[in-house]
């Protein structure tokens, strides 16, 4: 900015009272500007109206407004004044201190500004020099490139900061959501436990009433028996004193008197089983997931297995294959490729709308003879619209609340438990308890419909989180 114009602006920013740059400028009703502190001194010393120091217009104390725009302009002019002073100081150093000549050259080797006489001296003899304007233009471009690089780096850092900030917000939202979800789950567990508590109390009360009713009936029977026996005893004692013939005629009544059978009192056993969604089923799925695939060597000839050995379906056409003792021939079934003889394993099977299916495990010597399912075979299956059955030591029919289209199977070999879960509502379907002593192989009965049966694969968990 031109120095004359700057001087005019500086004069505009001078306070009429203190003759210095205005501090915290305020504007009176007459339109003149003053320092707030200066104007306050006036109304502290005077009573009544204040007269403007410039135009002598009267106005009451505190009847002014702060001029923020004028304050910003004053600060800007101060900054320009400082810059102008700095530029003047720099211009004062453009003359060579040795020879009092203008500095017009730049020594590339020594990176120093020189006058003409300095460039001819022995100190800079043979050095490449160029005009200051040319050197400054080149170095300005270098600096501009460096500035652009720095700006780009700053922009990248700012973008990363923004991303991290969004992640922090996301983590906070996720943590808040998890808190809400935990509160909801705890509330559901409390409701479930309260419902189970009331149901078990009611069932126990009904069992108590039933037992007391049976016991009272038994006591009445005993009392009747005792009364009859006492009456007969009196009669026999009376006959005992009579003749032999009379005694013998009454004897058969004693033989016909039978004591009632003892009444066995048994209380019902109660147990509480938490639903799968509250008993760590999600952790079981993540931590103990087994890579189960179908074994082609054991598959029935009419079963078609996918390339990844995760899907299988029944085909009507009978293919020409070589007979194998390992294959199932009587019905469309097959085993898994890998057997289990230790540890805990989980796999999940999609049965969809198949009308018939059976899932479970069997021992290697399992012959597939349906008449001998109590040995080496533990499974559940569907054989009709609403008919489900367990195969094993005990054949039991059951009816799920929700029809399962996906079944989760969890084997705890050491504990001797094989559990089946309905993954549609995450409820427990059935649990076998046994002492396993040999290798167990996943078993699959497909049925004769065309719909496929599929082994599902869940994403592999991050083991570092456990």
From Swiss-Prot:
SMART domains: BBOX, PRY, RING, SPRY. CDD domains: RING-HC_TRIM77_C-IV, SPRY_PRY_TRIM60. Transmembrane segments: none annotated. PROSITE patterns: B302_SPRY, ZF_BBOX, ZF_RING_1, ZF_RING_2. Zn(2+) binds at residues 96, 99, 118, 124. InterPro entries: B30.2/SPRY, B30.2/SPRY_sf, Butyrophylin_SPRY, ConA-like_dom_sf, PRY, SPRY/PRY_TRIM60, SPRY_dom, TRIM/RBCC. One of its GO terms (molecular function) is SUMO-ubiquitin ligase activity. E3 SUMO-protein ligase that mediates SUMOylation of TAB2 leading to inhibition of NF-kappa-B and MAPK pathways by suppressing the TRAF6/TAB2/TAK1 complex. This is E3 SUMO-protein ligase TRIM60.
